[in-house]
Structures are given as structure tokens and as C-alpha cells.
Amino acid sequence: MGRVEEESFRNGGLGRKVVRPALGGGLGVCERSMIANGQYQKKLEDLLIVCRKNLRSVNEDLIRRAFAMSLDAHKHDLRASGEPYFLHPYEVALVVAKEIALDDVSVAAALLHDVVEDTKFELKDIRAEFGDSVADIVDGATKITDIFESHEVRQAESYRKLLLSMVNDIRVMLIKFADRLHNMRTLEYLPPDKQ
């Protein structure tokens, strides 16, 4: 699962076990090396600076944990460009924080938006670690991906009706738009038939 350390967590008097990914713990040699020499740490700090500048309030612990889980979840994956896949959710989170200026929950969800569909992590892992708000947004983004990739829904009006009926939180749509925006910004790395 990529989960690294366990810790007890008390919430409202109810004890529950939370599994937290730790930076460096379950990561590959390349990622540990990049963290050790500050490459990913610099990206995390850059994201936090953007969040502090553009968001009303920032739960830095939430963003750090989402960053760590996303990095761990995508540690072996590469994009068509050859760069680490993790840079995609990172860039989506930057769009959400800088260009849309949503909130820290949305930034965390943006970092995690591909975790459920592309890795061994499940929605229950995200819910246990980050709570219902983040998990619900990630779940909505995953469902929207399924709709966009469906060949049955072809017309814009059908998309609109279907999406609006499924989405209770507009942040789901905005994160999905940020996801598509970053994908369009990096289209040159795909073969023409995939563009």
C-alpha cells in the first residue's frame, strides 16, 4: 500500500488508527535521494509559499501529508515526458492554489486526485488519513474521470447534465479543470493520435 508508519489518533474521544505516509520511508531510492538533496523539499516549500500567499488560511500539515502520500503513491510512475508522474498532481495543486485560489482542502485533494485510480491506495486510505472533505473531492474527481473517458456520453449538454447531477461540491469540477489544464499544457509529449 505504500503506507509507512502507524500512529494512534484520537478524535472526539474515539480512538482510531491512522496510517501516515512518511517522507523518505516508503519511497524509492530516487525519491529518497531527491528529498535528501532538497529537490522535493523545495517543491513542497514552493507550494506552501503559494498557498500562504493566495489562500485565506492554510493547514500546512494537511498539505504536507497530502504531498507525502502523493509522492509515495506515484513513486514508480513516469509521465509521457519522462518526468516523475508526481509532478503532475503537484502542478495541478499549484493551479488550484495560485490560479484558482481555492482552499487548503482543495490543494490536498489536487495532490491526491490520481491516487485512487492510478495506485494501490484506496479511497478508504485517503478518508482515514485526510477525512471526508478531501476524500469526497478525490472520489468526485475519480468519477468524473470515468465519465470523461466514457464513449457513451458524447454531447456537451449530456456532459453538463451528468456532471452537475453527480457533483455536490464545485471544487471537484475546478480540480478536474486544473487537471485537464495541466494535461493540455504538456500535450507535446504525447503522440499526435493521443493529443
Task: Mark where each language-model region is.
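Active-site helical microenvironments for divalent-metal-assisted chemistry
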Residues: 2, 9-10, 15-195
